[in-house]
Structures are given as C-alpha cells and as structure tokens.
C-alpha cells in the first residue's frame, strides 16, 4: 500500500473505558491509512487481545496496523512495527518480520538518523516533534527546515509527528510530508462521530486541490 495520508496513533489514557475500538473504527472510517497501537503497559494478554481486534478493524477498512516497540507482537500478528531510537535494532526487526513488513523509525530531528534507518531497511522515517506535544513534551524539537533538507535526500515516505493539528498539518504536507501522525488532535474527542469528522478533515488535506 502507498504510505500517504493520516497516521492515527492510539493513546491508552485517551482511549480507556471502552473507547479504543469505537474511536479507532471512527478514525479508519474517516480515512486513516495507518494505525499505530501504542501501549506501554506490561499486560501482555490485554495487549494481544486489543492488537488482534485492531488488526481486524484495519483489515476491514484497508488500513495497515503498526505495533509500537514490540517486534514479537508484530511478528505474531503479521503486522507492521514502529521503533524508537531505544527500542532495539531495526535490522534485526527486518530479519524477524520479513521484507514485506512495514517498519518505521523515529528519527527525532536528525537527518543522520533517518539516513541510517534507510540503510537498515526502514519503510518510513518519522521526524518530530514539530509542535508542543502532550504525549512527549520533552521530545527534541524539529524545524520545518529539516523537511526541506530531508525530502531530496530520503527515498522513503516521511512522517511528521508531535502536536500536529488541522491548522498546522497543511504546512508540513506542503513541504513534502507523506504521513501526519496524530494522537490528541484526533482522539481527544467527546464522541466517535467527532473522531470520524476530524479524520475526514485530516484525510482531505492529502487530496489533490
């Protein structure tokens, strides 16, 4: 599948109390192309259960599930993987998951990390945070000028993450970003209907003018 569009990322605090599946389905209905399951808890049985349910939803809507920082879970479910800089070897994950798996890499604000990820077999690279982030307030800041440098040098899709909203996403897309990764601006909503509305609005930003 072409890696372009809205990249929805779950948050276990935002999506508690039974909201995970209905809110995720709303995001997929609204056009999210990738969904990252991000849950840092140690409850492996629950994580497996939730990830299996999310995989079924993604298959239904033609989207791709990406698991955050758990190569074994990704391999068990036959889905993609996203690795941070401290989440283990990208080349080892590629060997485990195979050539066809989608594997993304966090590169913060460093073009050198992105070039290394390309060499190790990444499917996409992620830069950020570009704006103030509720999820990772202490993450290194990235500038939009980084995108100007990265686009001609990287042969892979570029993901932007970090405090992205409907107001700020267009400027990033105009600079060559292929995927906008969104958490709060998508899922911090009062209803599933509102999540779907926001997802449709983000997805529309990628449509030809």
From Swiss-Prot:
Cofactor(s) required, per the database record: Mg(2+)
General function of this protein: Condenses 4-methyl-5-(beta-hydroxyethyl)thiazole monophosphate (THZ-P) and 2-methyl-4-amino-5-hydroxymethyl pyrimidine pyrophosphate (HMP-PP) to form thiamine monophosphate (TMP).
Enzyme nomenclature, EC number: 2.5.1.3
Classification via SUPFAM superfamilies: Thiamin phosphate synthase
Pathway annotation from the record: Cofactor biosynthesis; thiamine diphosphate biosynthesis; thiamine phosphate from 4-amino-2-methyl-5-diphosphomethylpyrimidine and 4-methyl-5-(2-phosphoethyl)-thiazole: step 1/1
Protein residues bound to 4-amino-2-methyl-5-(diphosphooxymethyl)pyrimidine: 36-40, 68, 106, 136
InterPro entries reported for this sequence: Aldolase_TIM (IPR013785), ThiamineP_synth_sf (IPR036206), ThiamineP_synth_TenI (IPR022998), TMP_synthase (IPR034291)
Binding site for Mg(2+): 69, 87
NCBIfam families: thiE
CDD domains: TMP_TenI
HAMAP family (UniProt xref): TMP_synthase
Matches recorded under Pfam families: TMP-TENI (PF02581)
One annotated Gene Ontology cellular component of this protein: cytoplasm
Signal sequence range: none
Reactions mediated catalytically: 2-[(2R,5Z)-2-carboxy-4-methylthiazol-5(2H)-ylidene]ethyl phosphate + 4-amino-2-methyl-5-(diphosphooxymethyl)pyrimidine + 2 H(+) = thiamine phosphate + CO2 + diphosphate; 2-(2-carboxy-4-methylthiazol-5-yl)ethyl phosphate + 4-amino-2-methyl-5-(diphosphooxymethyl)pyrimidine + 2 H(+) = thiamine phosphate + CO2 + diphosphate; 4-methyl-5-(2-phosphooxyethyl)-thiazole + 4-amino-2-methyl-5-(diphosphooxymethyl)pyrimidine + H(+) = thiamine phosphate + diphosphate
Organism: Pseudomonas aeruginosa (strain LESB58)
One GO process term, biological-process aspect: thiamine diphosphate biosynthetic process
Domain of life according to the entry: Bacteria
Cofactor annotation comment: Binds 1 Mg(2+) ion per subunit.
Keywords: Magnesium, Metal-binding, Thiamine biosynthesis, Transferase
Protein name: Thiamine-phosphate synthase
Family: Belongs to the thiamine-phosphate synthase family.
Binding positions (2-[(2R,5Z)-2-carboxy-4-methylthiazol-5(2H)-ylidene]ethyl phosphate): 133-135, 163
GO molecular function, one term: thiamine-phosphate diphosphorylase activity
């Amino acid at each position: 599948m072409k890696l372009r569009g809205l990249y929805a990322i779950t948050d276990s605090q935002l999506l508690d109390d039974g909201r995970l599946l209905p809110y995720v389905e709303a995001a997929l209905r609204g056009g999210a192309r990738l969904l990252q399951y991000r849950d840092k808890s140690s409850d492996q049985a629950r994580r497996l259960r939730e990830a299996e349910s999310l995989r079924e939803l993604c298959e239904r809507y033609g989207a791709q599930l990406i698991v955050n920082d758990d190569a074994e879970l990704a391999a068990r479910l036959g889905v993609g993987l996203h690795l941070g800089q401290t989440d283990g070897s990208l080349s080892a994950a590629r060997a485990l998951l195979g050539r066809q798996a989608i594997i993304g890499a966090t590169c913060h604000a460093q073009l050198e990390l992105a070039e290394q990820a390309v060499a190790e077999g990444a499917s996409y690279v992620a830069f950020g945070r570009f704006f103030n982030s509720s999820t990772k307030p202490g993450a290194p800041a990235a500038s939009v000028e980084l995108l100007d440098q990265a686009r001609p040098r990287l042969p892979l899709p570029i993901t932007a993450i970090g405090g992205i909203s409907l107001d700020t996403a267009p400027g990033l897309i105009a600079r060559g970003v292929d995927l906008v990764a969104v958490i709060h601006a998508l899922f911090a909503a009062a209803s599933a209907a509102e999540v779907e509305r926001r997802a449709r609005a983000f997805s529309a930003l990628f449509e030809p003018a």
